[in-house]
């Protein structure tokens, strides 16, 4: 077992929490965007569409880098089997809890909102299964992907550790140019795989289980491993925490390319493959933008920040059905998109915080939504991982 840094990575805790909480304005703005969702406003807003696209273009790539960073830190702290058990429990238990308590009621509500309840009995067995796979996993998809990644990394992290024992990691040098080329190739590789599947057997791409377990894992795994490498190599971490005008400019140009692809691309052509290449390199450059920004402004301990770090997962889990409820039953009564967006934020965040405070007072719910046994500690002010 290797030692881990004693200094708390406050800025990474904060970034991870804020990235998760960004899911709230992301999904509320989705209601008012030009993108088709479960519920939409009568007229889309150009600026809220732009805001929605911006968040969507990089948020989860950066999130998985941080997840990989902390996962490898715990990999060095625990024996292999315990590491796998701890990691899977911390993401798997909240996911399994949220399905019957959150996404199943959400699915039932949407069946009536969208007028599909009467047609449900007429669906084939496969269509019912596939619909449930999409709707019950829903916004919990990243937890399922983390379970898959953790299982894969039992082997990957062992290989990384064994290779480090036979090499001098101090001589490893990284550059953003080299990383950009690597991630460009990874994006092209992913695009080739997706296009091949589209040619050979296109229906599998609309299968929810295949999409989450295979395609999402395949896309985000490089970011997860990059996070682990950032923990191992201080030079790589410094590359991300040091502000880079080149990365900022490249990310801005990549986002413009992302918007153009969204506007002019066609799903029947190469839109999704092009998007995977763009978001692969955009995600890499945004790691530098977000890490350097967070390292400069968020690398401190604060009771208020700690509260939201601890609350972020629960708030994210409950915000989705609250957002859809707001979109289905309240949005039609608000004529202004921006007013609706602000009211949605107040509605969702307010109720989510109230529910969070209630669940803290019920030990069983606290365990189910965190995946961690409830342990009473005195003066424990450190944010939970």
UniProtKB/Swiss-Prot annotation:
It is found in: Cell membrane. Pathway: Glycan metabolism; osmoregulated periplasmic glucan (OPG) biosynthesis. Keywords: Acyltransferase, Cell membrane, Membrane, Transferase, Transmembrane, Transmembrane helix. It comes from the Bacteria. GO terms for cellular component: plasma membrane. Pfam families: Acyl_transf_3. Its main location: membrane. The chain crosses the membrane at residues 17-39, 54-76, 88-110, 136-158, 179-198, 213-235, 242-261, 276-295, 308-330, 334-356. Its EC number is 2.1.-.-. It is a multi-pass membrane protein. It is an enzyme of class 2 (transferase). One of its GO terms (molecular function) is transferase activity, transferring one-carbon groups. GO terms for biological process: glucan biosynthetic process. Belongs to the acyltransferase 3 family. OpgC subfamily. Necessary for the succinyl substitution of periplasmic glucans. Could catalyze the transfer of succinyl residues from the cytoplasmic side of the membrane to the nascent glucan backbones on the periplasmic side of the membrane. HAMAP family: MdoC_OpgC. This is Glucans biosynthesis protein C. The lineage of its organism: Bacteria, Pseudomonadati, Pseudomonadota, Gammaproteobacteria, Enterobacterales.
